[in-house]
Amino acid sequence: MKAKYIFSGLLAMTLVSSCTDKMDYKEYNIYDKAYVEKMFGRVGGLMTEIYNDIDYDFGNYSGAMAGSATDESVYSHPGNAIEDFYNGAWGPTNAKERVWKSAWDGITYSNLVLDEFNDCTFPEYTEDEHYRQQMFLYKNYRYEARWARAFFYFELVKRYGGVPLKTRTMTATEANSLPQVPADSIFTFIDKECADIQDSIIVNYGDLGDMSFYKAQTGRANKLAVMALRARAALYRASPLFNANGDKSRWLKAAQLSNAVIAEARQEGMGLLPDYSKLFDKDSYKDGIKEIIFARRTAASNAFEKYNYPIGIENADGGNCPTQNLVDAYEMTNGRAIDEQGSGYDPQDPYKDRDARLAMTVAVNGEKWPDKDTLKTFEGGANSSSVTYGTPTGYYLKKYINKGTIIAKTGSNSFTHEWVIFRLAEFYLNYAEAALNYTGSGYTAPEGLPMTAAQAINVVRTRAKQPNMATGLSFDAFKKKYENERFVELAFEGHRFFDLRRWKEAPQYLKDIRGMKITRQDDGTMKYEGQTIATRTWDDKWYLFPFPQKDVLNCHLTQNEGWK
């Protein structure tokens, strides 16, 4: 049965405005609440719809990822909507509303589950052999729905700042009269919700004895997902965009909550997966992947591969092409930056002895990718910028791509993809950032906590076989190293777009976008020359999204600064 369920008794209360409620009711609209509450599966369908509204970025902007609005990548199709983020073409009438809509959809469904379907008993199924198990899962829905509602509010606050806070099903009049509350109040709500439910929600769906669930249920929010949301939200709340007064106690709380995630994960037998690339392949959903805390799994598809396979492959679009900015961020295996004295970097053999994560993330000239064909991104090459929609940077994307995918018009295949939302490595990095900003040093642990920022970062670096962080760095030098580590470890996972905003450092990083010009010499050798391929400007109003103009009018929102 499909996921969307509508009931006429609630329809009038829920179809009110795009700023607060679900707009796209299509199925079962002749049925009422009594119809839905008769069966586990019908109430479960509402929960499924909540999870379906969790956003992922396998090319949300007609193939482009949010990273292509940053220094992470460039989308190879000129004129794509992603360019609006850096050419100033977005605004209240072109507001990039995807998450604005899906988050309110998810909040609406969450409120429906909590208000209307919180006390079902399913009497017709009491004799069913699975009744106890189904009721156990059903009683967990209230905690899943509260987690999801908090998650959707986090997605809103990190984009828009203050928004209306809607915590129950409402009439149209009530919804349209909701006040817009400050961002800090939204963060308080998220923190309180997560604190209230983290000890009540299921800890591990696969470890419940005779109540354990089949594999398909393990993608639901559990205790660690609740703790992870709370910790990430605390990090954002402590960051300059939302912490104008520089309140250091917020950094301490963020460190404490990230440490709690790490401790709980260890208790559950989790750790960093030895093979970084396995986090993003077609089998990443399997139980053996002990680093992923929560992910959004998609149906089988080859669209992401079609978007991002190199031009020159049948039916490929070229897609999100990693920048030289990103490639340069990968250190040498000796732990030195490529421009650091003693690094050993050879500009004419630029990918030799580099951090192993580079080869797992970026496809470079001369390697076989995605299959047996050698990638030719040199000037005039089969996969180069000289071909329509060929890479403008000299690189193609590897991360998240299932290289066994065939996208040809005949004989194609497809695989599921799993968009990683929370994974353990992030929380070592989050801890490091919070500890650094609280103590002012990369080498001092906050009171009552077990690690320094350097020690936390070293856990992530060890998996990549990179040396430990250097000692004796100043605050600014350590911060730069930390931001670089976060850039490479979390590349193309949806963080860069928001990290540069919450740090309020976008102008520093988003000015010159660089690529690699590769020229084949007469003797067959390659000449490598880094070059600036775009120079961009920044407007501080872009730190927050504009509210859609129609909702400013309908929902009494105050437009974000600079967008009026």
Question: How should each PLM-predicted stretch be described?
Answer:
Residues 1-17:
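Sec-dependent bacterial lipoprotein signal peptides
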Residues 18-20, 91, 103-106, 191, ...:
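Long, intrinsically disordered, low-complexity segments
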